[in-house]
Amino acid sequence: HSQNHPLRPTIAGQPPPAESKELAVPKQSKYKGWHISQFIENKSLPWALMGLFIGFTYSGVLVFIPIELNSMGAGIWGSAFFAIFALMIIISRPIVGKIYARYGSKIIIYTGLGLFILGLFVLGLAITPLAILFTAPLLGLGYGAAQPAFQALAIQSAPIERAGVSTATYFLALDISVGAGSVILAL
């Protein structure tokens, strides 16, 4: 490792060295006061809608798992399910990032959605706590691959000076879908 690593001064409590890159200065809004374009980036909407789809579906898992396991008398298995689900997301992220960088988004999205859909299908057939637990890795890997790929594509779809608004657009759709989906699918 080099002595001149860019993080070295930051870790030592010193400011990082100045870079020669020019920063993009945000453009002045053409609207006075409040306008929806301050919060929503239209170019990011297709990917935000994909995030909405996966978030809505994920919210069904959040609602269904505890209820179903409790009805089987195996409520304690819910903790194991969500621990495995989260572990698969954590494990998948660095691997998914490298594959995304090398091969592009399509392989990540198709594989992620395929695993997530397979997990949902198996979950729909599951009649034992162990079968439900078996779906956690499939759902976790699928969600852990597809969700950040959609987020990255939402951000990349807009001009760099709108990256923050693109991020907000994506997470607005994701948050709405998880919140609304939990209510709608629990009915």
Indicate residue ranges for each PLM-predicted region.
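Intracellular juxtamembrane helix-capping segments at the cytosolic ends
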Residues: 145-158
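Transmembrane alpha-helical segments of major facilitator superfamily
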Residues: 80-89, 174
